Curated annotation (Swiss-Prot):
Residues 97-128 are annotated as: Disordered. This is Urease subunit gamma. InterPro entries: Urease_gamma, Urease_gamma/gamma-beta_su, Urease_gamma_sf, Urease_subunit. It comes from Haloarcula marismortui (strain ATCC 43049 / DSM 3752 / JCM 8966 / VKM B-1809) (Halobacterium marismortui). It is found in: Cytoplasm. The keyword Cytoplasm applies. PANTHER family: UREASE. Heterotrimer of UreA (gamma), UreB (beta) and UreC (alpha) subunits. Three heterotrimers associate to form the active enzyme.
Amino acid sequence: MKLTAKEQERLTVFTAAEVARRRKERGVPLNHPEAVAYISDWCIERGRDGQSVAEIRSGASKLLGREDVMDGVPEMIDMIQVEPVFPDGTKLVTVHDPIRSDSVGSADDETTESEAATDGGDSAGTDE
């Protein structure tokens, strides 16, 4: 099997995210790389499913709360940027302050209109 550098990176993120999912299910607090991979993988998969950039940004900030990660991790992650492949091409998704004290909830809930604000320049609509 021959993989491009981008495909290898994607598999690395997926593998780290899978470790993070298993640890989270067991109640083990996630470290920095696990938390970033967990959120990044979720964003990438939602892009592939065709969700909008705004929906992904909104949902991603609800995935992990402070109680899900080790002490100090929220302060280390002020922003996560990923480039999911959407049905119409690759776009940049930026999630600011992805781990919030009030963030625990279901990210699969419907996004309200106020949460689904404009991209704010986060989409780079380039095809790959």
